[in-house]
């Protein structure tokens, strides 16, 4: 009996021990996943969270890269017409769900967790780097909100992670007037600019102060001109037919649109000038084809196809690639084969000035006609001659050094399979490399690993010019200096007044002469014509 009792006692003790051990095990943090209490507590974790949230238009997939963003516009066409935009009665609600909050929630979560820890001194790491990564999150929230502003206008302003209670979600879904959303974006960009530097770990492959200021100028200019040119349409807060007027929660909302326009233009000028005054435009050697080597012949052309863009002053933010890490892209594969299934439109090509600064239709312009593309390009702005190609321009490389009998574009490849098709006859070679190792002349996908420009400093100069003229109805000394520098780089006479004097709207096919259906001032048109602030600014600066 004693023996039995002894075994029972030992069994109970062993069981108690196992239960205690089990409870201790269950109290442990999971070893295969990250938990809120253990993450976002040091510099490297902040860096990883921030860069994982990067979402920019870069080279990727089976296409020519960011250049395809201009497809379906008046500047660039693809084989499938964009009837949704341009044919009367065909406008449809997009399939893209712009009313989404996933990204905003993730960014708010970071700020909600990290800011208190940072202020309490609980984040491990170098203070400069900690501030950098917090600044990046503010930038990214502004970037996401700018997308919402462009797609939806009025939008809820959320700064905290919401509960899943229905009442809370309904309250948080109330849209704020678009000018308030724009001010919120500028506020986030101000915080980003204050926290970030222009020399972070990772260089300009990470966001910087200049990137924040550049985007701030873009957002502010966009909102100012939206308010100015769409006033009275019902799409501007305060309009009689503005939907917000019907909302009880906005019954006390007031706005002085003129003051708002002035505020945004002032902010755009200040932000743009800080960046514009710092940068040096990349040199244009005026060589339009490689002569002795696939590289080193024109820095301006090679700004879009070099492995390392870090030392280029004009490049504010860029994406690096590396074959050794299997981080490649397809840009040269498509552009060097003859088309990529897109091309510049005739209307866009017409906007490029002659070297003497005159429009093509002006007397004494030295325009050679358009019987052949190479004649149409003669005596033209070097941006057209460099980033498009005529029949006589080099198509691709087959060997190094440069062969004496090069492969040229010859006739436009308008009947090829889509990946090699030139849709309009005006072939685009921006962001194309002539290096064989990058895919020139080859039949293999994903050989390219040169960098991709995301933000260029020249945009700041353009934004300043436009904001200055919109605000003051004239150009100040800074705006004039920017304009002359851009024209000089393009090989165009820097005297912009002769261009303005020769401009005849009855001979212009460019949609950019209109805003909200009304012709704009000729100085404004010629200073910002066809400015495209997509990541590569493919259609940028053509007629200035």
Question: What are the language-model segments listed below?
Answer:
Residues 23-83, 155, 159, 190-191, ...:
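An aromatic- and glycine-enriched ligand-binding surface/loop that stacks and positions planar moieties
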Residues 146-150, 297-325, 522, 526-544:
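Acidic/serine-rich, low-complexity amphipathic helices located in mid- to C-terminal regulatory regions
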Residues 1-9:
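Bacterial N-terminal signal peptides that target proteins for export
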Residues 35, 41-61, 78-152, 168-209, ...:
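Conserved, well-structured interaction surfaces
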Residues 402, 458-464, 474-513:
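Active/binding-pocket-proximal capping segment
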Residues 19-21:
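C-terminal motif of bacterial Sec signal peptides marking the signal peptidase cleavage site
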Residues 9-17:
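Bacterial N-terminal signal peptides
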């Amino acid at each position: 009996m004693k023996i039995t009792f002894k075994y029972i006692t030992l069994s109970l003790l062993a069981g108690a021990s196992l239960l205690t051990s089990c409870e201790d095990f269950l109290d442990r943090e999971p070893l295969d996943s990250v938990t809120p209490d253990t993450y976002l507590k040091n510099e490297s974790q902040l860096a990883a969270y921030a860069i994982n949230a990067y979402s920019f238009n870069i080279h990727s997939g089976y296409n020519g890269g960011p250049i395809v963003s201009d497809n379906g516009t008046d500047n660039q066409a693809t084989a499938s017409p964009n009837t949704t935009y341009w044919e009367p009665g065909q406008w449809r609600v997009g399939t893209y769900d712009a009313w989404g909050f996933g990204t905003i929630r993730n960014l708010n979560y970071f700020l909600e967790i990290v800011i208190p820890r940072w202020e309490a001194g609980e984040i491990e790491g170098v203070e400069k780097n900690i501030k950098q990564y917090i600044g990046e999150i503010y930038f990214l929230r502004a970037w996401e909100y700018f997308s919402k502003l462009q797609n939806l206008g009025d939008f809820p302003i959320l700064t905290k992670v919401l509960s899943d209670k229905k009442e809370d979600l309904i309250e948080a879904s109330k849209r704020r007037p678009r000018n308030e959303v724009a001010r919120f974006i500028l506020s986030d960009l101000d915080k980003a600019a204050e926290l970030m530097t222009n020399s972070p770990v990772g260089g300009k492959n990470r966001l910087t102060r200049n990137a924040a200021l550049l985007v701030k100028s873009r957002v502010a200019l966009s909102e100012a001109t939206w308010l100015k040119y769409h006033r009275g349409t019902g799409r501007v807060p305060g309009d009689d037919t503005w939907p917000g007027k019907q909302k009880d929660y906005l019954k006390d909302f007031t706005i002085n649109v003129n003051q708002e326009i002035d505020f945004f233009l002032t902010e755009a000028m200040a932000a743009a000038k800080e960046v514009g005054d710092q940068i040096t435009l990349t040199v244009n050697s005026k060589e339009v084809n490689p002569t002795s080597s696939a590289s080193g012949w024109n820095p301006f052309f090679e700004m879009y196809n070099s492995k390392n863009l870090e030392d280029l002053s004009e490049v504010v933010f860029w994406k690096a690639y590396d074959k050794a890490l299997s981080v490649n892209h397809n840009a040269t594969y498509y552009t060097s084969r003859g088309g990529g299934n897109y091309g510049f439109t005739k209307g866009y090509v017409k906007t490029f000035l002659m070297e003497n600064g005159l429009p093509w239709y002006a007397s004494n312009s030295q325009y050679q006609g358009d019987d052949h593309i190479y004649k149409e390009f003669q005596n033209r702005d070097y941006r057209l001659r460099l980033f498009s190609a005529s029949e006589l321009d080099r198509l691709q490389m087959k060997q190094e050094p440069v062969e004496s009998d090069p492969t040229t574009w010859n006739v436009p490849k308008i009947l090829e399979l889509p990946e090699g098709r030139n849709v309009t006859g005006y072939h685009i070679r921006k962001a194309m490399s002539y290096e064989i190792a990058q895919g020139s002349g080859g039949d293999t996908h994903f050989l390219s690993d040169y960098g991709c420009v995301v933000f260029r400093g020249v945009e700041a100069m353009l934004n300043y010019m436009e904001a200055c003229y919109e605000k003051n109805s004239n150009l100040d000394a800074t705006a004039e200096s920017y304009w002359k520098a851009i024209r000089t780089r393009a090989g165009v006479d820097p005297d912009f007044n002769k261009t303005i004097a020769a401009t005849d709207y009855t001979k212009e096919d460019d949609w950019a002469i209109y805003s909200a259906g009304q012709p704009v001032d000729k100085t404004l048109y010629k200073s910002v014509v066809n400015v495209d602030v997509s990541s590569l600014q493919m259609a940028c600066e053509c007629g200035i």
